[in-house]
């Protein structure tokens, strides 16, 4: 039986009137690989911050390696060997790989002159421990997401890590990169280092994780060996409800044509793309990284406008030179990265909801705030956004609810065509099901829906046609029950 390295007992934490953690118990054994799961807003992030000393618990205690803490500080946590790798990896983009890995060592040295040879030696040694090779002189901003993560792990090892907590480490990775990350985690385990993976995709972590702890509404709801959980039980524990798998297969053959493109292209990116959409259609676009799938959405919204081809919307030929043209013609776009492209993080939930259609709230050069607030409240209710009112900052919402706000922002513009690029990336299973239901309802109302995604189950369940992109060209369009053959058709 492995020794318990960390144990949190009866942790309670509130922010104002919101109870983020309500008597949570959590433990990690030495060298254990554990998954911490739960819907966005369940308390996972708050628990991580308590364990790292970033937040003090209102009640409860944390025991690390036999040492009891009632008010754990970041210094205490790091001294005990706890390292947290957040989704942004906390790297310095303009510094080199070596400088990032050896950063904490440089700070501890407290010297005015930097020993660059020593910095390189330390970074190289840390990478060697994991069997990894990266160009030490390369600025981190030029690395892939997966390699930025490797840099963060190497830095954690230099700080004598005994427990590494990874917050949603697979969100922005390809399946190949996920496999590479899991190989690194196995190497960490062999060195006796425990790893906590924060994740809400059971199928992704099933083969590497030993034990699973699930939180819901700030409370423990399940804990046990991973093999005791199938997908159905996992989802029910996380959401408190049963989520039925539905397949979207409407009959649209004789319905009204709402959108079409013919020989659409952008020089050097993609070419010869043609498709037609009818009322009720949800068209999926997929392909491997670099296939041109995301660039089609950006072209149709005018971010990087097409250089050739014909576009028809609602029976009318349109030209798109920029984003303004797209919006004026009734096209809306939900981007892949909501934090940097979809939201104003310093603004309220309500302002983010109405900002795209701000002109319709103007009355003689002034904003009609009463009208705006009524619409804000309507969208919160209609999209089931978990917010008490429109006034709180958007940052207070979970990822799934933030994504619903991005969706509301563009629906407030009354679009004829809605393009979504990876709309459920980093979204918990409950919010994911809600978003899918919203898209189906919109399609039934006559709004054209283009769903760009590499999540094959998402496409199979929610699209009645899927276009496959390969090397910037259309490789085929699957319809109806043939969509089940997606994985075979994606292979080169």
Task: Describe the role of every protein-language-model region.
Residues 2-492:
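Glycine-rich phosphate-binding loops of nucleotide-dependent enzymes
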């Amino acid at each position: 039986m492995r020794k318990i390295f960390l144990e949190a007992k009866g942790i309670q934490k509130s922010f104002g009137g919101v109870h983020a953690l309500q008597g949570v118990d959590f433990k990690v054994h030495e060298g254990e690989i554990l998954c911490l799961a739960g819907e966005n807003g369940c308390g996972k992030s708050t628990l991580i911050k308590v364990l790292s000393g970033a937040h003090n618990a209102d009640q409860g205690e944390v025991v690390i390696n036999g040492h009891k803490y009632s008010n754990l500080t970041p210094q205490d946590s790091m001294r005990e060997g706890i390292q947290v790798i957040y989704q942004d990896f906390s790297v310095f983009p303009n510094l080199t790989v070596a400088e990032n890995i050896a950063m904490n060592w440089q700070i501890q040295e407290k010297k005015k002159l930097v020993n660059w040879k020593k910095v390189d030696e330390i970074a190289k040694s840390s990478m060697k421990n994991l069997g990894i090779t990266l160009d030490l002189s390369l600025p981190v901003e030029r690395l892939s997401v997966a390699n930025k993560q490797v840099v963060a792990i190497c830095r954690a090892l230099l700080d004598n890590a005994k427990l590494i907590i990874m917050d949603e480490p697979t969100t922005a990775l390809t399946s190949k990169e996920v496999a590479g990350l899991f190989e690194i985690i196995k190497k960490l385990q062999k060195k006796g280092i425990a790893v906590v993976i924060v994740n809400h995709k059971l199928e992704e972590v099933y083969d590497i994780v030993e034990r699973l702890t699930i939180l819901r509404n700030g409370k423990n709801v399940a804990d046990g060996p991973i093999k005791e959980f199938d997908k159905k039980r996992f989802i029910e524990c996380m959401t408190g409800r049963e989520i039925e798998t539905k397949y979207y297969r409407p009959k649209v053959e004789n319905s009204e044509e709402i959108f079409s493109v013919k020989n659409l292209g952008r020089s050097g990116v993609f070419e010869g793309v043609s498709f037609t959409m009818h009322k009720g259609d949800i068209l999926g676009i997929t392909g491997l990284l670099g296939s041109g799938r995301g660039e089609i959405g950006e072209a149709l919204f005018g971010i990087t406008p097409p250089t050739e081809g014909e576009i028809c919307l609602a029976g009318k030929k349109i030209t798109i030179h920029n984003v303004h043209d797209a919006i004026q013609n009734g096209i809306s776009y939900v981007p892949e990265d909501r934090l940097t492209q979809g939201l104003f993080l310093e603004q309220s939930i309500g302002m983010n909801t109405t900002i795209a259609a701000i002109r319709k709230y103007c009355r003689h050069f002034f904003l009609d705030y009463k009208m705006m607030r009524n619409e804000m409240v309507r969208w919160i209710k209609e999209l089931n956004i978990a917010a008490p009112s429109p006034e709180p900052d958007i940052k207070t919402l979970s990822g799934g609810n933030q994504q619903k706000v991005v969706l509301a922002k563009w629906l407030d513009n009354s679009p004829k065509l809605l393009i979504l690029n990876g709309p459920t990336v980093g979204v918990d299973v409950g919010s994911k099901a809600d978003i899918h239901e919203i898209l189906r309802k919109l399609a039934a109302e006559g709004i054209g829906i283009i769903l760009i995604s590499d999540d094959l189950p998402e496409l199979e369940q929610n699209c009645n046609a899927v276009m496959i992109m390969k090397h910037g060209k259309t490789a085929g369009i699957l319809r109806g029950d043939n969509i089940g053959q997606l994985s075979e058709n994606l292979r080169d």
